[in-house]
Amino acid sequence: MEKAKIHHIPFKLSGPAIEKNTKLTFKAEDKNGIWNIEDIKGKKVISLFPAINTKICDMQTQQIAKLAQEHKNVTFISISTDSVKKQEEWCAAKGLENVLIVSDDKYKEFQTKTNAYIPRINKLTRGFILLDKENIIQEISLNIELSKEPNYTLLDKWIK
């Protein structure tokens, strides 16, 4: 997938999306500073989204928080290009303390390595990436239409 749409308006991604069976390593930033995917052990789900203060991104991140409660054997990571401050404010406003949310704004490694990035608007696309304990991509699902929620049923099937 090299294109995404927002309300049917096409946008080019930064390149061809990363593929299954690829090792994904990256650093990002969280409220404590530098955050590294390699510090997280076990199976992981990365939930990527464009902007936390929008309706669909809000719903997606809250749904991920629910899934994290149901699937304790999986680490759920939410990532966007929002600033850490904006992410923290959102979490505080929603009362969500169990959400692992990181920012790709400073280091830009996630967007560079996955190409799940829309340069024209400086936002990530929407979707999920499932990693095994070695950080090898097992499944990937990126939305073509960003104004729609991702496929939670597919994600739930993957992690069972």
Predicted regions and their residues:
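Chalcogenol-based redox active-site neighborhoods
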Residues: 1-160
